[in-house]
Every structure is written in C-alpha cells, then in structure tokens.
C-alpha cells in the first residue's frame, strides 16, 4: 500500500468524480457506503435503497458506476422461481437466495416488477429476507431454502412509485429507503452551453469508465486500510448523534 492516507484516498475519489459527475457526488457516496457496509462487523440488518428520478436524472448512471464492484449482484429481472426453486435440476448455488450473502442485489429497473405476474409472491419473499430472517419453503420435494439469515443489501431505481407498486411495497414499511434525485435546474442558455461542450470533452462512455475505475480503486483501498473489517466502538458513540439517528428512524417509519 502506498503512503496515501484513507482521507487522501477519499479526497481523490471525490475530486475525480466531481470532474465528471459533479451533481451526483452525495448520492454516489451513499451507494458506495452501502456497498462498503459489509466491512463493518456486527451489522446484521439488510439495507434496501431505491433511487427515484425522472429520465436522464442520473439514477441509472449511478448504478452503472458501481456495477464493477465485487459485491454487486446485478439482476435485470426477478422471479420467485429465480430466488428459490424446488426444481431438482437447479443446483442451490445457481439460485439467487444462495448468492445473496455479502452481496448488494442491484435491480436497475425495479418498476417492471409491478407488472410481473409473480410480484405478489416476490415482494413478501423480500420482506422476509430484509427482516434478516431465515427463508425456507415446504415443497413436495421437502424443505428448501436456508435456515440462516442472509446479510445482504439491495439497490434499485425507478422513475416513481406507482400506486400499483406502492400497494406491493407498502407492507415492506421502513425496510425501504427512497432517495429522490432532483432535476437539473438550468435555464435554456445553460442547457445549450452544457450540450455544446459535450463534443469537446470526454464521451459519456469514457466518463463512465473513468468513474468506475476510481470507485473500484477507492473500494479496494477500503479493503486495504481495513483488512480485518471495522469494529464499532459503541462506548464512544455521541449521545446527541444517537438521538438524531433515533429521530430520523422515527421519521421514516
């Protein structure tokens, strides 16, 4: 490892991201933090966060930037059978349930699940998993699944939560957190100026590739700085901060 400190590594990460995606640094910080949360010991509760935003708001770009991280488990479509199947022809390791441990399940287009015929089965399944509970099914071939809770996180993106989708996810309560990406507030002249500069700068694909590399390098640095993980010192917790966190928890429940 170089003599670069963790703070210097973080500063370089922010500086590079600010160069190419200056209006999405905070949201990217949150996504990387969710991916890096596995380094913190004694966390057993899964986290689920969804990005909301209009087309071209950057939600898909944010997920694409972190796509190459080793903890990302990317899925474009989900079915109840894909999560856990009773078919004897499908090995346990090929089923999503047995791939979740230590991963961030990432669903870039979550809204289509609302139109999935099996959605009413999938959502209760994930409610149980996000509760940190074991997951088993009783079938004609016996009991399948796992008796151990899966430690995983979940990310997704959608334009908005439709009434139909809200009906499905509403019972999941505080297990889900939503971040609304603000629209770019630019005048016509500012928009024209931004668009005309695109031809003289790196292409979107090039910027995305640079961002992916810097995020991966930063994530790998976290692993180097904390090879044994991070043990939370609860005795050093600030009471005021704990109270603020508790108030926020009440707010989102």
Which role fits each region the language model picked out?
Residues 38-39, 120-144:
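Conserved catalytic/switch belt of AAA+ P-loop NTPases
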């Amino acid at each position: 490892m170089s003599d670069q400190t963790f703070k210097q590594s973080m500063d370089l990460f922010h500086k590079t991201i600010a160069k190419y995606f200056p209006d999405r640094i905070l949201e990217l910080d949150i996504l990387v933090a969710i991916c890096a949360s596995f380094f913190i010991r004694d966390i057993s509760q899964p986290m689920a966060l969804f990005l909301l935003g209009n087309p071209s708001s950057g939600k898909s770009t944010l997920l694409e930037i972190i796509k190459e991280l080793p903890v990302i488990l990317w899925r474009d479509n989900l079915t109840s059978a894909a999560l856990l199947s009773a078919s004897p022809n499908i090995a346990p390791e090929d089923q999503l349930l047995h791939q979740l441990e230590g991963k961030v399940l990432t669903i870039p287009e979550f809204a289509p699940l609302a139109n999935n015929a099996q959605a009413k089965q999938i959502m209760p399944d994930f409610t149980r998993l996000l509760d940190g509970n074991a997951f088993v099914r009783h079938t004609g071939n016996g009991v399948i699944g796992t008796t151990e809770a899966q430690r995983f996180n979940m990310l997704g993106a959608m334009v908005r939560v439709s009434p139909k989708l809200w009906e499905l996810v509403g019972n999941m309560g505080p297990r889900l957190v939503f971040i609304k990406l603000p629209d770019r507030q630019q005048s016509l002249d500012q928009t024209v100026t931004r668009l005309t500069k695109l031809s003289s700068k790196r292409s979107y694909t090039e910027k995305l590739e640079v961002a992916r590399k810097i995020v991966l390098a930063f994530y790998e640095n976290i692993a180097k700085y904390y090879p044994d993980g991070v043990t939370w010192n609860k005795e050093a917790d600030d009471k005021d901060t704990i109270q603020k966190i508790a108030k926020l928890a009440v707010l989102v429940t």
